[in-house]
Amino acid sequence: MHHIYSLLPLRDAARAACVSHGFLLFWRCYSNLTFNVSTLGLARKKSEDWGIFLIDIVDRILRNHSGNGVEALDLCLLSCENIDPSYLDRWLQIAVRSGIKEVKLEMSNFMKKKYSFPCSIFSDDAAASSIRSLCLSTCIFRPTTTLGCLRRLNALSLFSVQITDEGLGHLLSKSFALQQLFIFRCNAIICLKIPSMLQQLKLLTIKLCEKLQVVEINAPRLSSFHFDGALIKISVVDPSPLRDVYFSSPRPSRMLSYACTRLPSITRNVRSLTLVSSDEDANIPMLHSKFPRLKKLEIYIKRPQAVLSLISFLDASPALDSFILHVDGNFVRPDSVVGGENAADDPRWKPQCRHDFLRQVRIIGFCSEKNLVQFVIYILESTPRLDSITLDTTLLSGRMCDINGKSTKMKRRCAMMTEGCVAEAHRAVKVANRYIAGRVPSGVRFQVLEPCSQCHAHTRSRWYYYGLC
């Protein structure tokens, strides 16, 4: 019966405890403590009152809890801008004991003073040894040598946490079983060192850490590495286990140039590579190294004029099976649009290599830019075993509905587009039919997706708002 009771949602478990003495005993050992506006039934109250009610309810629940049997503590306090730190200290002392498996703390960005997470709760080996997932957001965290051994911790997420290089080093040195590490906007970190003792680490994600200058990776089994930020020095002692690599930079940073010169040394065994360039000029160095085992390549570029450089990426990937290109149609220059000339006559675009394993190609944000049209023709002429090619004229993530404009099961929406972007998309459809369709070999599935008529049927203030497909 206790197990069945533990499966009840928080509010249902609380109601049951009000009508039964037996359930009241179970309530005092309730294992899954998830506190947020939704689970506490505060959504119908005025949003400005959420913080007051949430603090009061959570405090009463935890004061009446025995502290035993808690497996998960999830505190979402985004609406609590003025919470007294003593409340948090007390709640953590009650719930974080032996047997705790998951701790998640989300604080408001608008607090005048950041909360300092008490490392002392993990100085006790009983609590430290049982924790499996730790997620902290918008707080101060200062681990020291007194930290207990987190021998079962396999997932660690730090969002906007004020933690130093030294503090993170102490934390990682006690986390031998760590498998996933996510670091987001931790701006006190300058040099991130992933020690070799993290034998089980498989996924490492680093995002927007503004002061980060160096990343040194010594984890011997790292298979997935995602990085989003300024392009810095990154070294991987043994890159052979890496299979999935994602690189993005939010600022103009010559991402593709960086990929040409820096990435081949760490991506020789990578199967999936994603590159997101916020801005790039056309003067990108040729890629002379190889990605011998790369199967999937996905690239985001803003300026379609830079598409010429991508040929070297295709030529450097002899085993490539799938290629996805995202282009921002807002950056089409009027003087670069395909005119009446033959779009395939430029000798620069004549195939130098055959891409014998490339079977699927998708271009999202396809437009009438001359270089992009020639790039598509290059792919058609150099890919003898191509199965399908899709030219999607919508922006961002592409078309979210099927080709008939019907709703998907998830009822996802196409991205909004300006009137100018929609006009360019329709022009791109005509260009594709005139210059590309006739060159597609028989047996290759060829699709040109224009903007969804339902998503972009109405305009307001020159913007096409999200519509339901």
What is the predicted function of each stretch?
Residues 419-469:
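C-terminal helix/juxtamembrane-tail motif
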Residues 1-187, 195, ...:
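Leucine-rich repeat
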Residues 33-36, 71-76, 101-106, 132-136, ...:
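Conserved hydrophobic beta-strand positions in leucine-rich repeat
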Residues 268-299, 318:
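Eukaryotic tandem repeat interaction scaffolds
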Residues 89, 93-94, 116-128, 146-153, ...:
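A structural signal for leucine-rich repeat
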Residues 234-253, 354-356, 365, 382-389:
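Leucine-rich repeat domain C-terminal region
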